[in-house]
Amino acid sequence: MLFQNVSIAGLAHIDAPHTLTSKEINERLQPTYDRLGIKTDVLGDVAGIHARRLWDQDVQASDAATQAARKALIDANIGIEKIGLLINTSVSRDYLEPSTASIVSGNLGVSDHCMTFDVANACLAFINGMDIAARMLERGEIDYALVVDGETANLVYEKTLERMTSPDVTEEEFRNELAALTLGCGAAAMVMARSELVPDAPRYKGGVTRSATEWNKLCRGNLDRMVTDTRLLLIEGIKLAQKTFVAAKQVLGWAVEELDQFVIHQVSRPHTAAFVKSFGIDPAKVMTIFGEHGNIGPASVPIVLSKLKELGRLKKGDRIALLGIGSGLNCSMAEVVW
């Protein structure tokens, strides 16, 4: 869906404070590597992930999302009382219930007229949250919305490394869980608004979505374990992305050479290289953070956009493509005009 009256009033991210290097992980896994005859540095040399960030052990998803939300509200220069909708989009969550959104809302002190809920759709959820908020803004139901995401990977690292260093772990089990060691922690938040309220702010034009849910078994995760068919996930993910890109060209009028930045969901070096090659994108237009931050799930797209803003790499009028894909499989592509 395309929008005429939706803008991004504020944007912020939080980098988790602690760095865990792939070298440190490999040192712990070396006995297993030796026993299974694995000689390749899969995390560093193949995935291109040399480090990832972790929170303090007691930090929950709502804590991280709250930090990012406060920062985004400052960036937007508005008070929390103006927010009419708060959507949390994280894969990580504090509890099955209540919603993580309600905890973030309570932390922030939203007004009683503010609607709050979680949206879960693997790594695509933040863009889904933007679209839901944009629909309500476009119809005039609300003036401002806050989309948040806080990802925590500490527990999955602890439990995955316990299993992978077990003396009886098989090579199949080892490879199935290896992708869990590419995850990273981080948080992002975005304040969206009706355009007439923030006339000079970047515009969110909306976009398109396609799905291939017959592939819902390729990546399955819970709080402490993730099992992934990385090869097939890459193959089928690129196929779905190609279909989505065709739709984006038709609906948004995209021509690759006319877009100024491509904000791609950050998974790994092979995934990014496949995206760039498949669509003929100039690599100079693709900022990557997976090398030092890992895969931060649905937070990765807004974090990259926020970092581009922070670094001064976005100028008025730039056309920015948001390319998101999530396990399931679901894919969305959208445009922001800065």
Curated annotation (Swiss-Prot):
PANTHER family: 3-OXOACYL-[ACYL-CARRIER-PROTEIN] SYNTHASE 3, ACYL-COA:ACYL-COA ALKYLTRANSFERASE. One of its GO terms (biological process) is fatty acid biosynthetic process. Inhibited by cerulenin. This is Acyl-CoA:acyl-CoA alkyltransferase. It catalyses: a 1,2-saturated acyl-CoA + an acyl-CoA + H2O = an (R)-2-alkyl-3-oxoalkanoate + 2 CoA + H(+). Its main location: cytoplasm. Gene3D superfamilies: 3.40.47.10. It is found in: Cytoplasm. Contains three extended channels that together form a T-shaped, three-channel nexus. Contains an active site base originating from the second monomer of the dimer. One of its GO terms (molecular function) is metal ion binding. Mn(2+) binds at H18, D56. The active site is at E97 (proton acceptor), C123 (acyl-thioester intermediate). Changing H265 to A/N: No change in substrate hydrolysis rate. Cannot form the beta-keto acid product. GO terms for cellular component: cytoplasm.
